[in-house]
Amino acid sequence: MVGAGINSRDFKERVPALVDAGVDVLVVDSSDGFSEWQYETIRWIKETYNEEVKVGGGNVVDKEGFLYLVKAGADFVKVGIGGGSICITREQKGIGRGQATALIEVCQARQEYFEQTGIYIPICSDGGLVHDYHMTLALAMGADFLMMGRYFARFDESPSKKLAIGN
């Protein structure tokens, strides 16, 4: 399986190239996924490629955001705004929510949606996962999979050479 992150600006050029190269999964990577841009991007991908490629949307922090992305056609939804180690969305836009609260609400919305439609939408917990037990907590709260940057960034092991910048 091959995945790629895209944005909501040049997707009409990038997505065809990625699909032609063999990508299986796309995610519209945005700090605030509850937007018309993301909705239009997901709709275009689903209308153009249908089930040929899976597409995820996010990030959202509540039921309304989850349902908005699902209505657009998202195959999975990323949850979390402001909890990531390099995220500045809370400071820049004044939005965000505690990761546990956001994850619980979105997973409850997902369960309600599943009970109404029979369609299960996987949830990715993205942000704020620092320690080992945070992974267990996120999965116990309903996440199907996790996105982690800070956790792995602290290790010396890497598939590439270490690059020292500055002092």
What are these regions, as identified by a protein language model?
Residues 1-126, 130-166:
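Alpha/beta enzyme core
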